[in-house]
Protein backbone atom coordinates (compact mmCIF):
# COMPACT_ATOMS: atom_id res chain seq x y z
CA UNK A 1 0.00 0.00 0.00
CA UNK A 2 1.09 3.57 -0.68
CA UNK A 3 1.91 5.70 2.37
CA UNK A 4 -1.03 7.92 3.26
CA UNK A 5 1.36 10.84 3.66
CA UNK A 6 3.04 10.39 0.28
CA UNK A 7 3.91 13.42 -1.85
CA UNK A 8 3.52 13.86 -5.59
CA UNK A 9 6.86 14.73 -7.14
CA UNK A 10 5.26 17.27 -9.47
CA UNK A 11 4.23 19.36 -6.46
CA UNK A 12 7.79 19.38 -5.13
CA UNK A 13 9.17 20.51 -8.49
CA UNK A 14 6.61 23.28 -8.84
CA UNK A 15 7.52 24.42 -5.33
CA UNK A 16 11.18 24.60 -6.30
CA UNK A 17 12.37 21.45 -4.51
CA UNK A 18 14.88 19.77 -6.83
CA UNK A 19 16.14 16.38 -5.68
CA UNK A 20 18.36 14.76 -8.29
CA UNK A 21 18.43 11.49 -6.36
CA UNK A 22 14.77 10.96 -7.30
CA UNK A 23 15.59 11.50 -10.97
CA UNK A 24 18.47 9.04 -10.61
CA UNK A 25 16.24 6.29 -9.22
CA UNK A 26 13.59 6.89 -11.85
CA UNK A 27 16.20 6.67 -14.59
CA UNK A 28 17.20 3.27 -13.29
CA UNK A 29 13.58 2.13 -13.19
CA UNK A 30 12.86 3.28 -16.75
CA UNK A 31 16.07 1.79 -18.11
CA UNK A 32 15.19 -1.55 -16.49
CA UNK A 33 11.72 -1.48 -18.05
CA UNK A 34 13.08 -0.64 -21.49
CA UNK A 35 15.91 -3.18 -21.33
CA UNK A 36 13.81 -5.92 -19.78
CA UNK A 37 11.05 -5.72 -22.37
CA UNK A 38 13.27 -5.46 -25.44
CA UNK A 39 12.82 -8.51 -27.65
CA UNK A 40 10.10 -9.95 -25.41
CA UNK A 41 7.61 -11.44 -27.82
CA UNK A 42 4.92 -12.01 -25.21
CA UNK A 43 4.95 -8.38 -24.06
CA UNK A 44 5.13 -7.19 -27.65
CA UNK A 45 2.05 -9.18 -28.59
CA UNK A 46 0.04 -8.07 -25.55
CA UNK A 47 0.99 -4.40 -25.85
CA UNK A 48 1.13 -3.95 -29.61
CA UNK A 49 -2.08 -1.89 -29.85
CA UNK A 50 -1.22 1.83 -29.93
CA UNK A 51 -4.80 3.12 -30.13
CA UNK A 52 -4.91 4.68 -26.67
CA UNK A 53 -1.41 6.10 -27.11
CA UNK A 54 -2.51 7.71 -30.37
CA UNK A 55 -5.73 9.10 -28.87
CA UNK A 56 -4.14 10.51 -25.71
CA UNK A 57 -0.66 11.44 -26.88
CA UNK A 58 0.02 11.63 -30.61
CA UNK A 59 -3.27 13.28 -31.55
CA UNK A 60 -3.66 15.99 -28.85
CA UNK A 61 0.07 16.56 -28.54
CA UNK A 62 1.74 16.15 -31.93
CA UNK A 63 -1.00 16.29 -34.57
CA UNK A 64 -2.79 19.21 -32.96
CA UNK A 65 0.37 21.32 -32.86
CA UNK A 66 1.23 20.29 -36.43
CA UNK A 67 -2.20 21.47 -37.57
CA UNK A 68 -2.31 24.72 -35.61
CA UNK A 69 1.37 25.72 -35.93
CA UNK A 70 2.28 25.12 -39.59
CA UNK A 71 5.94 25.97 -39.03
CA UNK A 72 6.26 22.74 -37.05
CA UNK A 73 4.10 20.54 -39.29
CA UNK A 74 6.84 18.87 -41.33
CA UNK A 75 9.08 17.69 -38.46
CA UNK A 76 6.13 16.70 -36.26
CA UNK A 77 4.37 14.69 -38.97
CA UNK A 78 7.64 12.96 -39.74
CA UNK A 79 8.11 12.16 -36.06
CA UNK A 80 4.58 10.74 -35.80
CA UNK A 81 5.25 8.40 -38.72
CA UNK A 82 8.57 7.19 -37.35
CA UNK A 83 7.15 6.75 -33.85
CA UNK A 84 4.29 4.51 -34.95
CA UNK A 85 6.67 2.35 -36.98
CA UNK A 86 8.93 1.46 -34.04
CA UNK A 87 8.41 -1.71 -32.01
CA UNK A 88 11.40 -1.68 -29.69
CA UNK A 89 10.23 -2.23 -26.11
CA UNK A 90 7.52 -1.48 -23.57
CA UNK A 91 6.81 2.26 -23.54
CA UNK A 92 4.88 3.74 -20.61
CA UNK A 93 3.96 7.01 -22.36
CA UNK A 94 2.84 8.66 -19.12
CA UNK A 95 6.12 8.59 -17.23
CA UNK A 96 5.98 12.00 -15.59
CA UNK A 97 6.36 13.69 -12.19
CA UNK A 98 2.58 13.74 -11.63
CA UNK A 99 2.67 9.93 -11.68
CA UNK A 100 5.57 9.63 -9.25
CA UNK A 101 4.56 9.27 -5.61
CA UNK A 102 7.28 9.91 -3.05
CA UNK A 103 7.00 7.47 -0.15
CA UNK A 104 9.17 6.43 2.78
CA UNK A 105 10.40 3.54 0.63
CA UNK A 106 11.27 5.72 -2.34
CA UNK A 107 9.46 6.80 -5.51
CA UNK A 108 6.50 4.74 -6.73
CA UNK A 109 5.39 4.96 -10.37
CA UNK A 110 1.65 4.79 -11.14
CA UNK A 111 -0.95 5.12 -13.94
CA UNK A 112 0.10 3.93 -17.40
CA UNK A 113 -3.05 3.50 -19.47
CA UNK A 114 -1.08 4.74 -22.48
CA UNK A 115 1.45 1.89 -22.25
CA UNK A 116 2.30 0.06 -25.47
CA UNK A 117 5.14 -1.63 -27.34
CA UNK A 118 6.85 1.08 -29.34
CA UNK A 119 9.44 3.86 -29.34
CA UNK A 120 11.39 4.29 -26.06
CA UNK A 121 12.40 7.76 -27.16
CA UNK A 122 8.88 8.95 -26.37
CA UNK A 123 9.29 8.09 -22.68
CA UNK A 124 12.57 10.01 -22.59
CA UNK A 125 11.21 13.09 -24.35
CA UNK A 126 7.95 13.10 -22.39
CA UNK A 127 9.66 12.81 -19.01
CA UNK A 128 12.39 15.33 -19.71
CA UNK A 129 9.87 17.80 -21.12
CA UNK A 130 8.25 17.97 -17.69
CA UNK A 131 11.57 18.53 -15.94
CA UNK A 132 12.69 21.20 -18.40
CA UNK A 133 9.38 23.06 -18.30
CA UNK A 134 9.74 23.21 -14.52
CA UNK A 135 13.24 24.58 -15.14
CA UNK A 136 11.78 27.38 -17.27
CA UNK A 137 9.36 28.15 -14.44
CA UNK A 138 12.26 28.43 -11.97
CA UNK A 139 14.64 30.14 -14.39
CA UNK A 140 16.13 32.30 -11.65
CA UNK A 141 17.58 29.09 -10.15
CA UNK A 142 18.42 27.41 -13.41
CA UNK A 143 21.49 25.46 -12.28
CA UNK A 144 19.57 23.78 -9.45
CA UNK A 145 16.34 23.41 -11.42
CA UNK A 146 17.98 21.68 -14.37
CA UNK A 147 20.12 19.30 -12.31
CA UNK A 148 17.48 16.51 -12.13
CA UNK A 149 17.19 16.47 -15.94
CA UNK A 150 20.95 16.16 -16.35
CA UNK A 151 21.15 13.42 -13.75
CA UNK A 152 18.24 11.48 -15.22
CA UNK A 153 19.74 11.40 -18.69
CA UNK A 154 23.23 10.54 -17.45
CA UNK A 155 22.00 7.57 -15.42
CA UNK A 156 19.54 6.30 -18.04
CA UNK A 157 22.13 6.43 -20.82
CA UNK A 158 24.69 4.79 -18.58
CA UNK A 159 22.34 1.94 -17.67
CA UNK A 160 21.66 1.18 -21.32
CA UNK A 161 25.33 1.34 -22.28
CA UNK A 162 26.06 -1.83 -20.31
CA UNK A 163 26.86 -4.76 -22.59
CA UNK A 164 24.78 -6.41 -23.91
CA UNK A 165 22.69 -3.38 -24.70
CA UNK A 166 19.38 -3.32 -26.59
CA UNK A 167 19.69 -3.43 -30.36
CA UNK A 168 17.81 -0.15 -30.77
CA UNK A 169 20.46 1.52 -28.63
CA UNK A 170 23.32 -0.26 -30.39
CA UNK A 171 22.04 1.18 -33.64
CA UNK A 172 21.94 4.56 -31.96
CA UNK A 173 25.61 4.37 -31.04
CA UNK A 174 26.63 3.87 -34.66
CA UNK A 175 24.36 6.64 -35.91
CA UNK A 176 22.58 8.42 -33.07
CA UNK A 177 19.05 7.71 -34.29
CA UNK A 178 17.68 6.85 -30.86
CA UNK A 179 19.17 9.86 -29.11
CA UNK A 180 18.26 12.26 -31.89
CA UNK A 181 14.68 10.99 -32.01
CA UNK A 182 14.47 11.32 -28.21
CA UNK A 183 15.46 14.97 -28.66
CA UNK A 184 12.69 15.39 -31.22
CA UNK A 185 10.21 13.88 -28.76
CA UNK A 186 11.46 16.30 -26.11
CA UNK A 187 10.78 19.24 -28.42
CA UNK A 188 7.38 17.94 -29.52
CA UNK A 189 6.24 17.32 -25.94
CA UNK A 190 7.37 20.76 -24.78
CA UNK A 191 5.58 22.39 -27.71
CA UNK A 192 2.45 20.45 -26.83
CA UNK A 193 2.43 21.99 -23.38
CA UNK A 194 2.51 25.56 -24.71
CA UNK A 195 0.55 25.17 -27.98
CA UNK A 196 -1.28 21.84 -27.68
CA UNK A 197 -4.62 20.89 -26.16
CA UNK A 198 -3.19 20.35 -22.68
CA UNK A 199 -1.16 23.44 -21.81
CA UNK A 200 0.70 24.02 -18.57
CA UNK A 201 -0.56 26.84 -16.38
CA UNK A 202 2.67 27.60 -14.56
CA UNK A 203 4.64 29.46 -17.24
CA UNK A 204 3.20 32.78 -16.16
CA UNK A 205 5.79 35.20 -17.53
CA UNK A 206 5.01 36.43 -21.04
CA UNK A 207 8.41 35.52 -22.51
CA UNK A 208 8.41 31.91 -21.32
CA UNK A 209 6.20 30.27 -23.99
CA UNK A 210 8.15 32.06 -26.72
CA UNK A 211 11.45 30.84 -25.30
CA UNK A 212 10.07 27.29 -25.28
CA UNK A 213 8.97 27.62 -28.91
CA UNK A 214 12.36 28.96 -30.01
CA UNK A 215 14.17 26.22 -28.10
CA UNK A 216 11.99 23.50 -29.62
CA UNK A 217 12.32 24.97 -33.10
CA UNK A 218 16.09 24.61 -32.74
CA UNK A 219 15.80 21.01 -31.54
CA UNK A 220 13.52 20.01 -34.41
CA UNK A 221 16.15 20.97 -36.98
CA UNK A 222 17.77 17.61 -36.31
CA UNK A 223 21.22 19.10 -35.85
CA UNK A 224 21.51 18.05 -32.20
CA UNK A 225 22.69 14.47 -31.79
CA UNK A 226 23.21 14.36 -28.03
CA UNK A 227 20.58 14.91 -25.38
CA UNK A 228 22.97 16.64 -23.01
CA UNK A 229 23.57 19.27 -25.71
CA UNK A 230 19.85 20.01 -25.77
CA UNK A 231 19.64 20.26 -21.99
CA UNK A 232 22.65 22.56 -21.80
CA UNK A 233 21.24 24.70 -24.62
CA UNK A 234 18.14 25.43 -22.55
CA UNK A 235 20.30 26.14 -19.52
CA UNK A 236 22.27 28.75 -21.47
CA UNK A 237 19.14 30.35 -22.88
CA UNK A 238 17.75 30.74 -19.37
CA UNK A 239 21.01 32.06 -17.98
CA UNK A 240 20.71 34.92 -20.47
CA UNK A 241 17.33 36.02 -19.09
Model-derived features: positions:
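Surface-exposed helix-capping loop/turn segments at secondary-structure junctions
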Residues: 35-46, 159-178
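Active-site acidic catalytic loop and adjacent metal/ATP-binding pocket
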Residues: 77-122
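ATP-binding pocket architecture of kinase catalytic cores
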Residues: 1-42
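Alpha-helical scaffolds flanking conserved acidic
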Residues: 178-188
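ATP/Mg2+ or Mg2+-diphosphate-binding catalytic cores
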Residues: 140-143, 189-241
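Residue-level preference for long, well-ordered alpha-helices that form the structural scaffold
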Residues: 15-22, 50, 65-68, 141-145, ...
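Active-site catalytic-loop/activation-segment of kinase and kinase-like phosphoryl-transfer enzymes
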Residues: 33-82
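Active-site activation/catalytic loop segments of kinase-like enzymes and analogous catalytic loops
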Residues: 121-171, 186-204
Amino acid sequence: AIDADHRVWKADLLDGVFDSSIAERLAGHLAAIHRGSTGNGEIAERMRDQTVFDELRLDPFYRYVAETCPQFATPLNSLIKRTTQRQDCLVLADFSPKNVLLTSNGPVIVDFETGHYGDPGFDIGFFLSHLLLKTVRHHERVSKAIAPAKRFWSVYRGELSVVPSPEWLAVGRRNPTFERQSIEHLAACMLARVDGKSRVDYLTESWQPDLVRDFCDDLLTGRHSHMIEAIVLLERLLECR
